[in-house]
């Protein structure tokens, strides 16, 4: 059912962002072929949560609070990075971000948005060279492009790329 739903949605519009839950990884390849934007592995997530809680006391409560939309004082979120910081360092952005109240910068989410759009733009950019070896190298990078790739606490010299968002922990008002 899940695979058919994603196929139907993507047939209507490739730009619609789709997220699907999988209980069994054996269907993963079908969802990837259907251009599913995000695949959530419920069992894998549960196993990791259980393993993490055995090592770090209270981890399940922390994660539940961060992911819950109606409980807790804070939540994980992403916000757009102003254009003037694209091409600058994470350290520069982190210093400027310190001025925001009620938010803590914890990382960067690279290549955000529709995987179809991200890959088309990356492909166009990769083809802007007349050097064949550079072109091949660029195309290999596009093939390995990971959409919505989180980088938690990157080094200060990390260069902020286009289509990235800041991962933040924000205090809820109210």
Segments and roles (model prediction):
Residues 1-174:
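Cytosolic regulatory regions of ion transport systems
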């Amino acid at each position: 059912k899940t695979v058919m739903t994603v196929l139907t949605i993507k047939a209507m519009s490739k730009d619609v962002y789709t997220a699907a839950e999988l209980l069994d990884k054996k269907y993963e390849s079908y969802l990837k072929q259907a251009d599913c934007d995000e695949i959530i592995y419920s069992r894998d997530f549960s196993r990791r949560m259980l393993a993490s809680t055995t090592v770090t006391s209270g981890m399940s409560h922390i994660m539940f609070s961060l992911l819950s939309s109606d409980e807790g004082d804070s939540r994980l979120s992403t916000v757009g990075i102003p254009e003037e910081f694209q091409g600058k360092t994470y350290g520069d952005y982190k210093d400027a971000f310190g001025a925001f109240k009620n938010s803590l910068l914890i990382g960067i989410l690279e290549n955000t948005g529709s995987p179809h759009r991200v890959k088309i733009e990356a492909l166009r950019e990769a083809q802007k060279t007349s050097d064949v070896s550079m072109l091949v190298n660029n195309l290999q990078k596009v093939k390995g492009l990971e959409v919505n790739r989180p980088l938690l606490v990157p080094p200060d010299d990390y260069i902020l790329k286009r289509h990235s968002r800041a991962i933040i922990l924000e205090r809820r008002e109210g």
